[in-house]
Amino acid sequence: LVGSEMCIRDRLYSEGYTAVINTTINSKGSATYNNAVMAAEEFYSVHPEAKGKFTIYNIDGESYSGAYGYAVVQGAMKATKDVPAADIVAFMEDWIKNCVIFFAPYTLKYAKKSGRIPSAAAFVGEVMGLRPIMRIHDHAIVTETKVRGDKAIVPKILDLTVKEMIPQTPYCIVYGNDESVRD
């Protein structure tokens, strides 16, 4: 990873770019962010003349692509409009800092396998029809609440989302492709 990032940064620098913005997955769940920081340090050790001419911004996504993806797309759109890199980074970091994800598994099978839910709790939850509503924010995944039955999931997520929304700011509501549970 570090080597491939070096090649990209070398190429961008040699082509005259003045900045690169790199957004990575949650630094507490992956070493990608720390590797990117090390790659930036290595780039400047190889190219000391680049300091002050070529800025490498590494942004910790603090979550997963479903959360920071919007900021990345918006940042790319801003870049095509010649918005300064520092302003793009400020926008992206603000979005990431304020972004909260709510989701719920329709089966506890995978949550049990991953260790997020103990086996006994998963068994009882399946028998009783309990579904955890999970919250991802600031590097952490926690169980926000539980609902009984699949049909209660979406209304509860919408309720929680409305409570988290900051007025007059963009938001995204995303659902999977199983239309039988969407409706």
Model-derived segments and spans:
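Short, small-residue-biased leader/transition segments that mark boundaries at the very start
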Residues: 1-8
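Short, well-structured alpha-helical segments in soluble
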Residues: 9-15
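Structural motif
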Residues: 19-21
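Active-site microenvironments of hydrolase-like enzyme catalytic domains
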Residues: 23-27
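Mixed-charge interfacial surface used for oligomerization/domain docking
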Residues: 28-32, 36-41, 45, 51-57, ...
